[in-house]
Amino acid sequence: TLLGPARTQIRAKVPVIAVSAVRTGCGKSQTARYLSGLLKRKGKRVAVIRHPMPYGDLARQAVQRFATRADLDAAACTVEEREEYEPHLACGNVVFAGVDYQRIVAAAEAEADLILWDGGNNDFPFVRPDLHIVLVDPLRPGHETSHHPGEAVLRMADVVIVAKSDAAKAEDVRRVAEAAQA
């Protein structure tokens, strides 16, 4: 039996906004950083939880907290991890990651009024969102309904953002918007 998010997501004690996408490269992390800025300007303490990247010593990486580049150095983060974490740090965000999801959520809750899930690899959030924002990409029309888990993520969305609409053909923007409404 393959368990889905309804049975596996962790419930947080603080509100959670999840930002996901139907495919990698949709602009999810940029959107998450934009939202974190809006929330912080409204006086909210935001903790970012980044989709885990289980490279290396998983026991040592059970719960990770990054507030500075020195934290990344101390954790011997990979190039791939740095590419995801450094832009958040540059925005003043504290990033939590790792593989012990329950402890990660508890650590983030202790520091924040709100958790912002910055998903990765077009996967489900491991923490249950109160608001789930999903990006679709009109430069790749049809991918929102032809790839897993992207299509399932789209079906879970509370809000859909058609990203890159300024660079796409109007017909492709219409097509992905219609797919999102179906």
Q: Locations of the language-model features?
A:
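Conserved glycine(s) of the Walker
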Residues: 26-27
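Flexible phosphate-sensing "switch/lid" loops adjacent to ATP/NTP-binding sites
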Residues: 17-21, 30-33, 37-181
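Short, well-ordered turn and helix-capping elements at secondary-structure junctions
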Residues: 4-6, 23, 121
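Short, basic phosphate-binding NTP loop
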Residues: 1-18
